[in-house]
Amino acid sequence: MEGIFYALIPMFTWGSIGFVSNKIGGKPSQQTLGMTFGALLFSLAVWLIVRPEMTLQLWLFGILGGFIWSIGQTGQFHAMQYMGVSVANPLSSGSQLVLGSLIGVLVFHEWTRPMQFVVGSLALLLLIVGFYFSSKQDDANAQVNHLHNFSKGFRALTYSTIGYVMYAVLFNNIMKFEVLSVILPMAVGMVLGAITFMSFKISIDQYVIKNSVVGLLWGIGNIFMLLAASKAGLAIAFSFSQLGAIISIVGGILFLGETKTKKEMRWVVTGIICFIVGAILLGVVKS
């Protein structure tokens, strides 16, 4: 029970990143740079307190992983700009779970028993149904929907999902480091990635500075993710953390004024239920 409580913290902190950053404002590149600065400050503080042993391998893979992460985060910020937070974030979380699970099954053979394939396939089906309903648009809301560019949003989500899943595979399946050890090299890679996406034209303005708060949310989520994994297992902790999409949906509607018709609200609730059940089933399969 304690582990599940810890897992709820990254659910809220990571789920809040999208609407908090969009409430602050700025371009996706400014949002990413500000977030990575905050993450770097948080990581430096953790390093000064913990003083973990640092190896060359840890630095190299940590920086590489952070750079790959920045691809995922920049794409997600672009997707939120094109589609809205309440649509983009659940699609992003769900697509990460689906693609990550498929890679785990096909490449790393994480499912070995028949029951795992049955329950896992049901979980993936529920996530796909959740995709459909969370992004489904009502024709009656066309005046609002025309302000969004869903084709660009889906393209941004595609490379965002690839970046996030590559990052997850690197640290969960290929190289396994302690989070408290790798968090600083990873933050350095995140900053380098953000600077690259700005074409090395760094401009520290109010949006970059304010978005550093979002980096603190990321860091707090990482610490509690570590605690949750130690108490309840990584599979359960990760699956629960991905339910932050629910926080994104609610935050986008309440704090960013993203409008939904009654029909769209019913679809959103259906999508949320599918996400919750699908994510929990995936956690059960992996554990």
Curated annotation (Swiss-Prot):
Key word Glycosyltransferase present: no
Membrane topology: Multi-pass membrane protein
Pfam family, one: Sugar_transport
Transmembrane domains' residue ranges: 1-21, 30-50, 52-72, 88-108, 114-134, 157-177, 180-200, 213-233, 236-256, 267-287
GO CC, one annotated term: plasma membrane
Keyword set, alphabetical order: Cell membrane, Membrane, Sugar transport, Transmembrane, Transmembrane helix, Transport
Coiled-coil region list: none
Protein name per its UniProtKB record: Putative sugar uptake protein SPy_2205/M5005_Spy1856
Gene Ontology MF: a single term: carbohydrate transmembrane transporter activity
Coiled coil as UniProt keyword: no
Subcellular location: Cell membrane
Homology family: Belongs to the GRP transporter (TC 2.A.7.5) family.
